[in-house]
């Protein structure tokens, strides 16, 4: 049972508390939160990055116009199904306050960009 989660290295799937799933560029980011253990200030979490699958779809058959679209990775679908099973479909929901969500997304983007800049600078120093 829960073979997909076990293949990710999660030995005790019943310790999963919740999860979040977000899209970042051409990847889906899955973050799994575990139940907090006694004596811990924060619950443990793990993060996984899945590339989105690309498909070319026919938009207009008359003009034979095609459009590239992306969709969730097939393996990730199975993992999310198992997580929904474990959490009874209760995962961290989007905030009703859209302004706060946008601000959080913006702060996260700032961190991602800063980390990428640092990585590029380190690569430049190696040259």
UniProtKB/Swiss-Prot annotation:
> So where does this one cross the membrane?
none
InterPro entries recorded for this chain?
UPF0325
What domain of life does the native source organism fall in? Bacteria
Concerning its family, UniProt says:
Belongs to the UPF0325 family.
What is the name listed in the Swiss-Prot or TrEMBL entry for this protein?
A: UPF0325 protein AHA_1169
Specify the taxonomic lineage.
Answer: Bacteria, Pseudomonadati, Pseudomonadota, Gammaproteobacteria, Aeromonadales
